[in-house]
């Protein structure tokens, strides 16, 4: 009850539409019947706001308004010469939340026996907050990140292997070269959370992720922001358009965006759907708002040979 009372006045801002709301309006449900694909309708698993999610929402408030404002000013200065990702890494900001430990347990349970253990790969892991939640279930973890600052943050967290790289083309070989005893056949579970709208070629990314998975048994956890509004963040802080365009709407309902991502991107590459869920993609707040949020679709997939 105490946590519920504490969060009653939270101010959360949607980073897409600028709407302001409290935690009770965070998106977890969906109009499942409106999904065009029967596979999507049948595999939808509803998650919900829980105590771990609420704890994350309160972090900015716990840090204090003055400290949040100081960090925001410093971030603005740094962004004159570098990307937001790199500035956040230097300042210890930019923590993200996609799902709680209980959420992960629900999704892994749907995958059946053998979904835990073995080796886990998190591609584009950021500062490692979500990586750590997932990594608890595995014997070994490799985290990749293209930002030097974020890669340093990952090393501080003590993951088994950290690769500073913007590609996963040779990730199994590189992990083994650094002492990781991942199978030559690939990783047991791979996560790519909110990368498809930030890379030059999302199809190439998914093909590489599929090759990094163990055939038959490997699981891919893929989170994509909906509506889909892609851009590439360059090292100097500028933005450019991806090389590859997808026929996916940049506005409209979550359901229409998910349908388009499934038919345009995911299904044609041969993935089988295990579960689909809707979760808020939460970013740590600042002196203006307690948190910022985007709308995520989480696809749990298998890649048959």
What does each model-identified segment do?
Residues 169-184:
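Short conserved loop adjoining the S-adenosyl-L-methionine
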Residues 217-221:
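Short glycine-centered segments of the SAM/dcSAM-binding site in methyltransferase folds
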Residues 191:
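A conserved beta-strand element that flanks and buttresses the S-adenosyl-L-methionine
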Residues 117-126:
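Conserved class I S-adenosyl-L-methionine
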Residues 194-198:
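A short His-aromatic
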Residues 204-216:
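A short glycine-rich, Lys/Arg-flanked "PGG" loop and its adjoining helix->strand segment in the class I
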Residues 1-116, 129-130, 224-225, 230-304:
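N-terminal accessory regions of S-adenosyl-L-methionine
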Residues 127-170:
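Class I SAM-dependent methyltransferase SAM/SAH-binding core
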């Amino acid at each position: 009850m105490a946590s519920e009372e504490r969060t009653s006045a939270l101010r959360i801002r949607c980073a897409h539409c600028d709407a302001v709301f409290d935690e009770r309006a965070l998106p977890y449900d969906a109009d499942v019947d409106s999904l065009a694909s029967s596979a999507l309708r049948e595999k939808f698993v509803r998650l919900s706001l829980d105590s771990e999610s609420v704890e994350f929402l309160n972090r900015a408030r716990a840090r204090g308004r003055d400290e949040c404002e100081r960090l925001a000013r410093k971030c603005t200065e740094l962004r004159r010469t570098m990307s937001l990702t790199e500035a956040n890494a230097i300042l210890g900001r930019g923590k993200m939340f996609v799902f709680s430990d209980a959420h992960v347990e629900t999704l892994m349970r749907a995958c059946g026996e053998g979904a835990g253990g073995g080796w886990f790969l998190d591609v584009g892991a950021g500062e490692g907050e979500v990586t750590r939640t997932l990594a608890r279930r595995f014997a070994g973890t490799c985290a990749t990140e293209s930002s030097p600052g974020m890669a340093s943050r990952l090393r501080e967290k003590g993951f088994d292997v950290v690769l500073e790289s913007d590609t996963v083309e040779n990730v199994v070989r590189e992990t083994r070269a650094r002492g990781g005893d991942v199978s030559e056949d690939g990783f047991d579970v791979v996560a790519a959370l909110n990368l498809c709208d930030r890379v030059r070629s999302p199809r190439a990314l998914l093909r590489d992720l599929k090759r990094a998975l163990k055939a038959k048994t490997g699981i891919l956890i893929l989170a994509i922001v909906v509506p889909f509004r892609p851009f590439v963040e360059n090292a100097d802080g500028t933005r450019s358009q991806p090389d590859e365009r997808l026929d996916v709407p940049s506005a409209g309902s979550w359901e229409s965006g998910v349908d388009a991502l499934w038919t345009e991107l995911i299904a044609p590459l041969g993935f089988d759907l295990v579960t689909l869920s809707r979760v808020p993609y939460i970013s740590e707040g600042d002196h203006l708002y307690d948190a910022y949020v985007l709308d995520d679709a989480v696809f749990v997939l298998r890649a048959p040979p």
